[in-house]
Amino acid sequence: MTTFSEKEKIQLLADIVELQTENNNEIDVCNYLKDLFDKYDIKSEILKVNEHRANFVAEIGSGSPILALSGHMDVVDAGNQDNWTYPPFQLTEKDDKLYGRGTTDMKGGLMALVIALIELKEQNQLPQGTIRLLATAGEEKEQEGAKLLADKGYLDDVDGLMIAEPTGSGIYYAHKGSMSCKVTATGKAVHSSVPFIGDNAIDTLLEFYNQFKEKYAELKKNDTKHELDVAPMFKSLIGKDISEEDANYASGLTAVCSIINGGKQFNSVPDEASLEFNVRPVPEYDNDFIESFFQNIINNVDSNKLSLDIPSNHRPVTSDKNSKLITTIKDVASSYVDKDDIFVSALVGATDASSFLGDNKDNVDLAIFGPGNPLMAHQIDEYIEKDMYLKYIDIFKEASIQYLKEK
């Protein structure tokens, strides 16, 4: 039994794909969802982050247990739209694929949750407990929306949290964190013909970077035991097992220098230069360790000339890989997809769970699971398979019913 026809389910997704939320303007999706939920007499609210950014919260049922279902409303920039085969902000159905920015990451997953929630309410299928929908702003960058919801206590009483990021047949119980670390060197600018009376900031920065590479290589050499196992994820992505060495490397801490800036013109000694790193913390080497790691190198080089800024700081998240939520999703999904394709793994990326759970993470069943091929995220001509989008609505409904009944 369904409340919406297949055509209506696709149109609902089309409606929010048309709302351009490239790292902003989630308020438009919130207003759309508010009107939709009001139509079905479902209690909901909009919580503003700022004038244009907001979260949306809706709830059905009452009492315990409480299952939170979450998805983010922002999408990444579409880039040069001339490079797209189909308009990025207009849903296009072609060869059983639904094209558009955010179809995979992750308006497809979000709308699947929305439809599941409405149909559960309309069909009076909720056996007991509460389902709380948390649609967030700003996941792609600073997780402002998730932080606001956590600060206001929307996760304090939940028993389970499912985030419908695009995972295909993967079910994730944990993931790495993510940190942006910017190291800035300062010097003294002079004309390049008299460099000896100046102080080249690039030289100081290179000294830092050389020491960083040396210390990082030492750390990775000893980084051999990990709580997180990401090997099943990579096996799914590349279609074969990865070597033990590669699995060990991928499951541990990683740090990449991704941006370098220094100097403004060739005939001036630069007085400022910077390096920016993306670091993926793990339980063994967490965010506090990373900050100390960078600061110790800075102190060793010259703390008067070097400074550290951490504009983005999301912690790794762990949970029980055999939790009731994980096993329930695995059991339900096996009726819709090939059982041999289903796997449970840790994830190398980060999600809103970093901001949602905080100190409460040990008490919450976590599952990251949703429709879409993760390799399609952020791509030109992004699409979600129509059949997968529709199937996951039913998976979400059945898994929610079973989890709340048996938790």
UniProtKB/Swiss-Prot annotation:
- SUPFAM superfamilies reported for this sequence: Bacterial exopeptidase dimerisation domain, Zn-dependent exopeptidases
Task: Show the stretches that span the lipid bilayer.
Answer: none
- Give me the residues that bind Zn(2+) 1, please: H72, D105, E165
Q: In which pathway does it act?
A: Amino-acid biosynthesis; L-lysine biosynthesis via DAP pathway; LL-2,6-diaminopimelate from (S)-tetrahydrodipicolinate (succinylase route): step 3/3
Keyword Zinc included in the entry's annotation:
yes
- Key words of the record: Amino-acid biosynthesis, Cobalt, Diaminopimelate biosynthesis, Hydrolase, Lysine biosynthesis, Metal-binding, Zinc
State which Enzyme Commission number(s) the record gives.
Answer: 3.5.1.18
Required co-factor?
Zn(2+); Co(2+)
| Pfam short name (any one) | M20_dimer
Q: Per the record, what are the reactions this protein catalyses?
A: N-succinyl-(2S,6S)-2,6-diaminopimelate + H2O = (2S,6S)-2,6-diaminopimelate + succinate
Domain of life here?
A: Bacteria
Give the cofactor note text: Binds 2 Zn(2+) or Co(2+) ions per subunit.
Binding residue positions for Zn(2+) 2: D105, E140, H378
Q: Name one GO biological process term.
A: diaminopimelate biosynthetic process
Query: Where in the sequence is the active site?
Result: D74, E139
- Tell me the GO molecular function terms: metal ion binding; succinyl-diaminopimelate desuccinylase activity
Instruction: Please report which protein family the annotation says this sequence is part of.
Output: Belongs to the peptidase M20A family.
Supply the PANTHER family for this chain. ACETYLORNITHINE DEACETYLASE, PEPTIDASE M20 DIMERISATION DOMAIN-CONTAINING PROTEIN
Any idea what this protein is called? Probable succinyl-diaminopimelate desuccinylase
Q: Which organism is it from?
A: Staphylococcus aureus (strain MRSA252)
Show the taxonomic lineage: Bacteria, Bacillati, Bacillota, Bacilli, Bacillales
